[in-house]
Amino acid sequence: LMLGGILFGWAKPVPVNFSALRRPKQDMLWVAVAGPASNLVMALGWALLYKMAWLNPDNYFAEPLLGMAGIGIKINIVLMVLNLLPLPPLDGGRVAVSMLPHRQAYQLSRIEPYGMFILIFLAITPVLGWILMPLVSLMYQLLSLLFGI
């Protein structure tokens, strides 16, 4: 949905029933890591598809697959790195809260109501790019080395 030239909308967090967790603080770590881990698995899958298309350039579908797989790799790497930022409500913020001592975890968790505003501010300034790009480039290089692409 476009509203006034600005994309309006955001990904919704996966609902988690905290009362169903046996050890909420520790188990929240695993819940939070699942999102970025799924992005990593998808990036690996796209990299494998990219390699297969690259090895068969005469195939009719090679060129479109290379384009789709390249974008799939980039999107999933960016989402993984973004979600690992230690800013609640992002997954990285939840990981940090679950690993910090109680007092520091409480202080960090108090940022959560403002986390999206902080993230939007970072996104409309060059700061988010300064933070993300070195990590995104590193992950992209690691995938390139792993798959020889």
Predicted regions and their residues:
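Hydrophobic transmembrane alpha-helices and their immediate loop junctions
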Residues: 1-149
